[in-house]
């Protein structure tokens, strides 16, 4: 029998998970960066102080990288408060999750631990194991030289070999390096041709110091760029006349691709309609995987109101999530209907505009008699205010008490004032979402927010996700680093 305390704990964990998925401490449409950070810091301190085991278990869920780093840092800072068994379990989760983070973020975490003087044995062991697992220490030494050197010092680790040690601590002492990448870096100081064999971020500094024209540099460094760098720079490269910098859009992750599409002017989207739509649909099919076409009849209510602009630092992020969810739901469903709050029916030309008439769109969606209704919105229903909550209440309590239609609200925006994502109705489960690729898992998680979920059930779910994470042996996030050293992905 669940106690009242267990029910409160389950609700607290779900609230924190929603925050950890969506919040990044950056400015949102309705809240400043300071408000976001203050709210998020309180939640982390509250969870760590009251539910340490569950707090660590959240690492196994699809929380964003910003909150992964915050969780890891707080767990390592408070190692003395954990039991031996807790430290063992936390260490395994931390190691598994760090392996999935981009290297720059991990190095920034190590730097923060060094500045905070967190240097216990467990911290040094985690740093040692992560550094030992890096596929190419020479690449890290060139690309992240200062951070790499600081991490070795903090963890009391020697570099892997005398040559790497010389490169890190006295790089100009040698007249020649045997490691090809280190030798390329040495030659790039006086040979312009050598810089094009370096990773883009390193070569860019050499090019600026040597006065290489931007267009020439971008044309020649293009084969060394990672997929993300190519996507980010291709429009800038075109403006400089470097036409060879072209990203393979069919290989891009869905949400990142949606952000890129929305960054283009409307006339460019019209001109490239076939290319962009094809790439979005291909990414959606990859994300759907074995669930493709198995969700039955699905209707989505998608928020493209003015608040979907987000903020200057998260420009159009809520709208990008909605656009990506639109294409993913189309791949998951056997029969799919999309209803945008603006009333537009051309998703490719979406842009943030107007109020948020969620209530009216939900009525239209329920008229289609779907087996699943998915609402992707920041929850600021304002045309008229409160209509969505009343529609959902009447639907759930009067018209569909048997729950023939599954309704879930996915919210990409953290509400700092409420310490959670903004909910539309107590009768409908709400989950935070950051990347559309996580949609299926989040719909699964949202079921715990429906009704009064017990702590035992939620704990079992976290343990199952932790087992899945620990069983994973591949590190997908190292691919871009290997590409930067060995060339572009085919």
For the regions a language model picked out, list residue spans one by one.
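Generic intrinsically disordered, low-complexity segments enriched for polar/acidic and small residues
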Residues: 1, 13, 26, 39, ...
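Acidic, glycine-rich A-domain
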Residues: 1-87, 266-476, 480-490
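An N-terminal, globular interaction/scaffold subdomain
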Residues: 28-165
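Generic hydrophobic segment detector
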Residues: 48, 55-65, 73-76, 88, ...
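Acidic/polar low-complexity segments with low predicted structural confidence
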Residues: 115-292
């Amino acid at each position: 029998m669940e106690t009242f305390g267990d029910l409160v704990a389950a609700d607290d964990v779900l609230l924190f998970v929603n925050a950890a998925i969506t919040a990044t401490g950056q400015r949102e449409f309705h809240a400043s960066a300071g408000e976001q950070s203050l709210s998020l810091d309180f939640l982390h301190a509250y969870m760590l102080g009251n539910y340490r085991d569950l707090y660590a278990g959240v690492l196994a869920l699809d929380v964003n990288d910003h909150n992964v780093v915050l969780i890891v840092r707080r767990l390592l800072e408070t190692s003395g408060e954990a039991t031996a068994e807790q430290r063992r379990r936390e260490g395994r989760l931390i190691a598994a999750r760090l392996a999935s983070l981009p290297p720059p973020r991990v190095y920034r975490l190590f730097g923060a631990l060094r500045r905070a003087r967190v240097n216990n044995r467990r911290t040094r062991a985690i740093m040692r194991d992560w550094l030992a697992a890096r596929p190419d220490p020479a690449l890290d030494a060139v690309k992240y030289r200062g951070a790499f050197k600081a991490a070795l010092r903090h963890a009391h680790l020697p570099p892997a070999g005398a040559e790497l040690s010389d490169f890190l601590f006295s790089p100009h002492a040698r007249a020649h390096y045997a490691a090809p990448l280190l030798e390329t870096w040495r030659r790039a100081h006086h040979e312009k041709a050598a810089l094009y064999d370096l990773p883009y971020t390193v070569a860019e500094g050499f090019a600026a110091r040597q006065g290489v024209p931007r267009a020439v540099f971008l044309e020649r460094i293009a084969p060394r760029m990672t997929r993300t760098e190519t996507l980010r720079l291709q429009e800038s490269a075109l403006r400089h006349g470097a036409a060879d910098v072209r990203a393979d859009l069919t290989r891009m992750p869905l949400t990142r691709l949606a952000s890129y599409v929305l960054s283009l002017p409307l006339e460019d989207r019209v001109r490239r309609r076939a290319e962009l739509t094809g790439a979005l649909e291909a990414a959606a099919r990859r994300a759907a995987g074995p669930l493709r076409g198995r969700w039955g009849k699905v209707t989505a209510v998608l928020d493209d109101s003015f608040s979907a602009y987000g903020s200057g630092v998260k420009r159009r992020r809520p709208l990008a999530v909605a656009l990506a969810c639109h294409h993913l739901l189309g791949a998951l469903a056997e029969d799919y209907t999309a209803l945008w709050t603006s009333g537009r029916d051309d998703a490719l030309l979406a842009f943030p505009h107007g109020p948020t008439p969620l209530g009216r769109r939900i009525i239209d969606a329920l008229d289609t008699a779907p087996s699943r209704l998915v609402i992707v919105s920041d929850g600021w229903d304002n045309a008229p205010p409160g209509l969505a909550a009343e529609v959902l209440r009447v639907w759930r309590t009067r018209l569909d008490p048997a729950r023939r239609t599954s309704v879930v609200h996915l919210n990409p925006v953290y509400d700092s004032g409420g310490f959670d994502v903004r909910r539309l109705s107590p009768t409908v489960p709400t989950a935070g979402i950051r990347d559309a690729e996580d949609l299926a898992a989040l719909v699964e998680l949202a079921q715990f927010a429906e009704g009064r979920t017990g702590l035992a059930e939620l704990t079992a779910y976290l343990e199952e996700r932790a087992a899945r994470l620990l069983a994973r042996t591949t590190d997908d996030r190292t691919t871009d680093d290997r590409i930067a050293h060995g060339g572009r992905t085919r």
